[in-house]
Amino acid sequence: MTSGHRGRHLPRAEAAPLGGSSEAGVADGAATAMPSSPLRVAVVCSSNQNRSMEAHNILSKRGFSVRSFGTGTHVKLPGPAPDKPNVYDFRTTYDQMYNDLLRKDKELYTQNGILHMLDRNKRIKPRPERFQNCKDLFDLILTCEERVYDQVVEDLNSREQETCQPVHVINVDIQDNHEEATLGAFLICELCQCVSISPAPATLSP
C-alpha cells in the first residue's frame, strides 16, 4: 500500500454529474450501511471498468460521495486472446460496449464475466470517465495499482494551484480480476470508513 502523497486540486468546474446512486444500502455479506459521509472520494484504476467500479458500487451503497475513473488513454477489455484486447474510447458507453461484445461472442464474454461486469457498470453510471479530464475536488483519492498512482500524482502536480485544498492519495494494489476487485473494494471501503471518523482530511498529516 502506497500512501501519504499530498496533492492539490482545482475548484469544481466542468465536471460530469455523478452517475452512481448515493443511496445507502447493504452489499452482499456487508454490515449495515453507514450514514451519508461528507468525505469526497475518488477511486481510480486504468480503464474504469473492474476495480474502480466495484469499489464505486460498494462505497455508494455505504453512503459515501464517490466517483470512479480510469487514467488510460483508452478503455481496454479482455479479448479472445491476450494480444487482442477490445479497445474503446472513454466516450463509449457501457451499454455500447455490452452490445458490441454480445454481438462478437456472447458465450466467451459471458463465461469470463465481462458481460456481467458491464451490466453492473451501466447501472452505476453511463460511461467510463478519465481522471485527467475531471476538475472536481476530492478529499481522498484511492488508486488500484502503483502505475495508476503515479499517473494521478503526476496529473495533480501538473495542475495550476488555485486553492489550498489538500487531497490525500493512497494506493491499494489490487489484481485486475473479479475476485480480487471484490476483496479490494471491501478493503477500500474499510479504509474510507476509518478516514471518515478521523480528523478532517484537510488536517491530517501528510
Region spans (language model):
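Short polar/charged helix/loop
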Residues: 2-206
